[in-house]
Amino acid sequence: MIYMKLIKYLFYIFMLLGVTGVWAQKSDIRLGKLLNNGDWFTLEEEYPMIKDSVQTPMLRLMSEALLGYYFNRPDETITCVDSLLQHYQAELGLGNIASMLLVKSIVEANRGNYAVAADILKDFTSQLREQGVAMDYTQIDEAVQFYDRFRNCPPMSIELPQKNTVIAMSNDSIRLNIKNDTVQRGTSMYVSITVNSKQYKAIFDTGASTTFMSEAFAKKTGVRLIADSLQIHGGITVYGQSGILDSMQIGDIIVRNIPITINKDTTLNKVEDIDLSLIHI
């Protein structure tokens, strides 16, 4: 179970309660539209200009929580989610509460706090089940199981050099080692990485929620398996494995204890000149 882009059932929040004034109402509607559309880059650009005229505090907190998530401001996300859950549970409704808790658990897991991430969701579903609340628990239960498997693993850490460093990147088209293949698959960013003193080429995907390897490459680099029968949710749902890579070097930066998603699909092995499919640090 991996969230490739984040949560699928997001927030339908055109609940502009208590809005006064035409311009204030326009700001709330604009904010709600950007949230519902998942237009995070536009929201990041426009939010500083309209936030003071937004009349619905819940919308402001939700915007800041999700902007913090998508633009790597984890403290901001945690603070805003906690405030939302403390003050606006009735307005949020059960679906949005679940989504906000999933966001919080993902942030904690990204920090390496796997036990905290699992327990946030486990406590939530335990309370609902005790109360006999009927809902689809599948996604949350999968997240709990996933984070539980990493519960005793050390958190990922990054060792930075004492000086500024530049990491070389290149852009190139995606090609498969298939005879007479002419399909256009777009372009990706590529970086050079070092694992176990050997250099490899990797796709650098800023939207990936995990570092992603083929089964063959995971074995080659000595990834320690944590769990089998892992559901991987992307365009389709497939089954793979999860594990930990002890270390990886990118330029002068060393990353340790990296969570890895392993795809058993041999299609990954056909990507031309690529060893590591997706990297997320």
Language-model segments: which ranges?
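Pepsin/retropepsin-fold aspartyl endopeptidases
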Residues: Q25-I279
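Bacterial Sec-dependent N-terminal signal peptides
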Residues: M1-L31
